């Protein structure tokens, strides 16, 4: 990608650090992301900086992902992987401070498309018959 054309994506307010370095690797991408989001070596979700250090070993999804994302903005991943509102309430105790404005232009307003869709999915899941899953789980255990 050429720096002059990066704004066409409209996702970020600045060109990603190390993105023009060849080759772009997972490690260079993560390094650039850590530098760009200014999470100060902690985790950023929306407009907050969080210290999940004490939570790493308790994370229900395992320790790998949460360790690897330290120092980055995990907003979109946090939203996509947590359908219930419980995790959002739980992270409040880990908040260190408010953060500067995000470099990403994606929004997750409470009355916006994504949050509305997420709420509708949450409601729909309450009505889904879970018997086929239970039957499948039992047969897997045999």
From Swiss-Prot:
Keyword Iron part of the UniProt annotation: yes
Protein name stated in the entry: Cytochrome b5-related protein
Organism: Drosophila virilis
Coiled-coil ranges (or none): none
InterPro entries xref list: Cyt_B5-like_heme/steroid-bd, Cyt_B5-like_heme/steroid_sf, Cyt_B5_heme-BS, Cytochrome_b5-related
Purpose: May play a role in muscle cell metabolism.
Keyword Iron included in the entry's annotation: yes
Entry-linked PROSITE patterns: CYTOCHROME_B5_1 (PS00191), CYTOCHROME_B5_2 (PS50255)
């Amino acid at each position: 990608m050429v720096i002059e054309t990066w704004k066409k994506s409209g996702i970020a307010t600045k060109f990603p650090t190390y993105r023009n370095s060849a080759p772009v690797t997972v490690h260079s991408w993560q390094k650039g992301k850590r530098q760009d989001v200014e999470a100060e070596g902690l985790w950023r979700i929306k407009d907050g900086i969080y210290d999940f250090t004490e939570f790493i070993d308790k994370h229900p999804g395992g320790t790998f992902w949460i360790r690897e994302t330290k120092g980055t903005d995990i907003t979109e991943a946090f939203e996509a992987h947590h359908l219930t509102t419980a995790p959002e309430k739980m992270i409040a105790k880990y908040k260190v401070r408010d953060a500067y404005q995000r470099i990403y232009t994606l929004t997750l307003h409470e009355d916006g498309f994504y949050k509305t869709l997420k709420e509708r999915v949450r409601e729909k899941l309450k009505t889904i018959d879970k018997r086929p899953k239970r039957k499948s789980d039992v047969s897997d255990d045999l």
